Every structure is written in structure tokens, then in C-alpha cells.
């Protein structure tokens, strides 16, 4: 699949923009704070209905405006689709072929993207929240039911946390309601857990050989899910629910005292092992970056295996963060099969066939100038 054109209105520092793209490589060049990352972000937001940079939608709207809009034309193997996302202070509304979608979960996954930005290099050594977000965003693209379960889980979690804070003063009168929320949380949480297990099993199948290739056969990558309760992938759903319920009973008083939910998928984590050593703790910066690169390249292949079309790859100021060898491995892997967007302050130092015949987009203070490099 590829995005053939985009239109922006009141998006970040863009008052109005209409732009067409090449189906292979598009290089967005500009100095810092000119709008190149905003353009890249707009493509991501059009696909995912949320930003990878902020959770505050108001930041996506141009200063002193009430709304922002992103439109795009998506070309798939057997169809051409128009996508539209309208952003206001009240929230977001999505349209697909001019038809408004009742739920964003119906819209997400139509256009698949893989974002690789400098902060993704922190996927290994960053906080558990970074890794959970990685799971949620990537799984949501290929499993709409996951997004539904996640949204329901988060609603119940908010209600349960509010009740726990209320119970800090007097817990006896609210225990029945707490049990109701606990059972609802377990119901949605176990389904989230199962989907994560399934996803990571597939990701492992793709990431391990990719990592082996980048490391020239010297390293074996293993991805391990670390749940906040003592459950495993081999357990059936009823057993997982049973373990969750027992765990919630054992931490009930601590949760009331702390006023928050202490276990569940929102507290889980991922660990990455290279040659049986925890990369987060014992890995070199090179191993951590190889692991992050392996995961991103695995995402591309995993999405293709699930939806039978390659996703759009967004490389936001990340090539300069990779050494020549990893940079070449990345560009060799995607060459000719994935529509790719690259942001950079300069193409100097990036010598690769992939960038030949790329469309070059120069961004200066929210305006663009385009050319196709046929050198």
C-alpha cells in the first residue's frame, strides 16, 4: 500500500498544504523546527488517529484555530481509498470514503504504518510504558478487537482507580462495587493478555532471524513478556482469570491504601535477551540499537503476513542515529517493496540506491518545495 497524496488544514505549523508522494521513497529535508517532523506525524496520525509525540490532541491544531484536518488518498492492491481525520477540542472524527466512522477502532488498521524515530531506540532501555505503548499501537493496527478490549479495560481501570481513592476513607461500603469492577477488569484484561501473547509469538518469529542477520550470525534475540501476575502463555483463559482473581484478592488492601490498581496489563512489561543476557541491563548501545532495529523490521514483515500488503515506513530523523552498517541493512531490507518517508536535515552521508529517484520535499517554516531526484 502507499499514500499518494495528503492535504493538511490548520495542522501544527501548516495553515494549508496539498502534496503528492512517490510510491517508493520520499525524502523530507529541512532544518529543525521547520515542519518536517510535523508532516511525518500527520501521515502517522492519519493512519493511527493519534500522535506518537503527544497525547494532547489540542497540540495538533494550528495556534489560534479551533480545528485541524488531515486528508489522504491511499492506494491498496485492489482499491483506492480516501481517508479523513478531523480534530477539534471535542475530539476526533474519522471518515473513510466520505463516510463517517462511528468508532475510531473501525478506522484504525485501514492504513498501516511503521514509525521509526530516535525515541524508538529507547524501546529497549526506556520505561515499561514505552514498551506497552509499542504493543498497543502495533497490535491495534492488525487486531481491531484488541483496540476495543483495550478501550473497555481503560474505562473500567479509571472507574476502579477512582473508587479505590474513595475507599481510602471508608472501604467497607464500597467492596461490592470494587468486586464488580475487578471482574470487569479481569474479563477485558485476560483478552488483552492473550492477544499480546499471540502478537509477541509472531514478532519473535520475524525478529530473531532479522537480528541474527544484522549481527552477522553472532547474536540470538529472545522476546519475553513479563506479566504483573504469575500467568503464562500455556494457560487457558479460565486459568488466567482464576490467577488474576486470586492476585487481586491478595493485593486488595494494598490497592485501597495506595488508591490505585497495582496489577493487570497496564503494569506488564517486555524484556529482550541477546544470547541469554538481558539487553536492557547488560547490552551495549550497539546491541540495544540492533534490537530496536530488528523489532521495527519485524513489524514490517509481520504486518505484511497479516494483511498481505506492506505498511508505509516512516523514518523520522533516525538514519543519522544509526551507524553505516545498520543504516545500510535497514535500507537494503526495505528497498523496492515499502513506501518510505525519510526526514533529515541533509542527505549528505546517506549514500544508498534506495534514495535514488526519491522525491525530495524541502520544508521551510510550514511551506514545501518538491523535486524528483533522478541522479
Curated annotation (Swiss-Prot):
Q: Which PROSITE patterns match?
A: RECF_1, RECF_2
Where is it predominantly found? cytoplasm
Gene Ontology CC annotation, any one: cytoplasm
Tell me the compartments it is located in: Cytoplasm
User: Which keywords annotate this record?
Assistant: ATP-binding, Cytoplasm, DNA damage, DNA repair, DNA replication, DNA-binding, Nucleotide-binding, SOS response
Biological processes, Gene Ontology terms:
DNA replication; DNA synthesis involved in DNA repair; double-strand break repair; SOS response
Family membership noted in the UniProt record:
Belongs to the RecF family.
Q: Which PANTHER family match?
A: DNA REPLICATION AND REPAIR PROTEIN RECF
Q: What is this protein called?
A: DNA replication and repair protein RecF
The encoding gene is recF
Amino acid at each position: 500500500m502507499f499514500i499518494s497524496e495528503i492535504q493538511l488544514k490548520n495542522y501544527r505549523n501548516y495553515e494549508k498544504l496539498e502534496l503528492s508522494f512517490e510510491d517508493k521513497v520520499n525524502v523530507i529535508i529541512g532544518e529543525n523546527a521547520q515542519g518536517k517532523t510535523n508532516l511525518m506525524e500527520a501521515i502517522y496520525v492519519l493512519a493511527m488517529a493519534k500522535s506518537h509525540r503527544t497525547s494532547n490532541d489540542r497540540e495538533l491544531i494550528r495556534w489560534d484555530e479551533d480545528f485541524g484536518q488531515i486528508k489522504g488518498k491511499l492506494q491498496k492492491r485492489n482499491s483506492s481509498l480516501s481517508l479523513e481525520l478531523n480534530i477539534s477540542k471535542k475530539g476526533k472524527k474519522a471518515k473513510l470514503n466520505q463516510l463517517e466512522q462511528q468508532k475510531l477502532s473501525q478506522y484504525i488498521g485501514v492504513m498501516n504504518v511503521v514509525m521509526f524515530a530516535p525515541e524508538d531506540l529507547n524501546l529497549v532501555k526506556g520505561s515499561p510504558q514505552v514498551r506497552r505503548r509499542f504493543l498497543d499501537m502495533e497490535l491495534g493496527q492488525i487486531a481491531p478487537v484488541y483496540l476495543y478490549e483495550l478501550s473497555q479495560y481503560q474505562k473500567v481501570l479509571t472507574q476502579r482507580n477512582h473508587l479505590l481513592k474513595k475507599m481510602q476513607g471508608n472501604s467497607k461500603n464500597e467492596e461490592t462495587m470494587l468486586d464488580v469492577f475487578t471482574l470487569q477488569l479481569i474479563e477485558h484484561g485476560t483478552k488483552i493478555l492473550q492477544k499480546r501473547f499471540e502478537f509477541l509469538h509472531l514478532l519473535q518469529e520475524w525478529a530473531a532471524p532479522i537480528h541474527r542477520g544484522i549481527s552477522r550470525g553472532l547474536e540470538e534475540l529472545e522476546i519475553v513478556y513479563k506479566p504483573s501476575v504469575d500467568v503464562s502463555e500455556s494457560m487457558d483463559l479460565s486459568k488466567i482469570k482464576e490467577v488474576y482473581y486470586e492476585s487481586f484478592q491478595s493485593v486488595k488492601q494494598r490497592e485501597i491504601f495506595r488508591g490505585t490498581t497495582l496489577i493487570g496489563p497496564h503494569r506488564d512489561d517486555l524484556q529482550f535477551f541477546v544470547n541469554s543476557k538481558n539487553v536492557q541491563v547488560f547490552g551495549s548501545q550497539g546491541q540495544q540499537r540492533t534490537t530496536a532495529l530488528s523489532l521495527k523490521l519485524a513489524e514490517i514483515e509481520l504486518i505484511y503476513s497479516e494483511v498481505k500488503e506492506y505498511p508505509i515506513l516512516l523514518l523520522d530523523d533516525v538514519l543519522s542515529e544509526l551507524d553505516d552498517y545498520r543504516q545500510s541493512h535497514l535500507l537494503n531490507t526495505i528497498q523496492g517493496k515499502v513506501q518510505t518517508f525519510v526526514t533529515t536535515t541533509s542527505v549528505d552521508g546517506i549514500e544508498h540506491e534506495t534514495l535514488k529517484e526519491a522525491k525530495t520535499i524541502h520544508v521551510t517554516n510550514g511551506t514545501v518545495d518538491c523535486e524528483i531526484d533522478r541522479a
